[in-house]
Amino acid sequence: MEFPDLGKHCSEPTCKQLDFLPITCDACKQDFCKDHFSYVGHKCPFAFKKDVQVPVCPLCNAPIPVKRGEIPDVVVGEHMDRDCTFHPGRNRNKVFTHRCSKEGCRKKEMLQLACAQCHGNFCIQHRHPLDHNCQAGSSSASRGRTSTSRAAEQKPSGVSWLAQRLRRTVK
């Protein structure tokens, strides 16, 4: 039993199939079945307005114009071979850029480890004030304060707290 009022007929002249879930073309605004809804499937006369692709180069992030009828993958490949400004061997970013400020130490770290007292940049081995002979914390005013009053003024971070605990157990 057919329901002629339910659904719509495909607008493709060679099909005219009654489709219960028709798809409307966003370019020509006609209804099509699942086989003819693509621009190529029904030879849409307004496809040039909608079927535009501008791929982006995965290396240099530049938009690459693609002419009508060209395959985007081929155009991107040609761009990467000829016109791409990114050269993997030349533009390599350094990872270990933060050099230790301790005299005689030449280590470099990925992350900046700044001393809270003298604000110098140090490697993991010299990151604590006692390890790099910190000059900012050696004033007479800072020596006069007790360790409990220092802890009350500023709450130590988890890393520094753990380091202090480990130093106490090692000594």
From Swiss-Prot:
Region listing for Disordered, in residue ranges: 134-171
One Pfam family cited in the UniProt record for this chain: zf-C2H2_ZFAND2
Source organism superkingdom: Eukaryota
Protein residues bound to Zn(2+) 1: C10, C15, C33, H36
Compositional bias of kind Low complexity: 136-151
One GO CC term on file: nucleus
Residues engaged in binding Zn(2+) 2: C25, C28, H42, C44
Positions with a binding annotation for Zn(2+) 3: C100, C105, C123, H126
Residues engaged in binding Zn(2+) 4: C115, C118, H132, C134
Entry keyword annotation includes Metal-binding: yes
Keywords from the UniProt entry: Cytoplasm, Metal-binding, Nucleus, Repeat, Zinc, Zinc-finger
GO molecular function annotation: zinc ion binding
GO biological process: cellular response to arsenic-containing substance; positive regulation of proteasomal ubiquitin-dependent protein catabolic process
The keyword Nucleus is assigned to this record: yes
Positions annotated as zinc finger (AN1-type): 4-52, 94-142
Subcellular location: Cytoplasm; Nucleus
PANTHER family given in the database record: AN1-TYPE ZINC FINGER PROTEIN 2A, ARSENITE INDUCUBLE RNA ASSOCIATED PROTEIN AIP-1-RELATED
Protein name, per record: AN1-type zinc finger protein 2A
Gene expressing this chain: Zfand2a
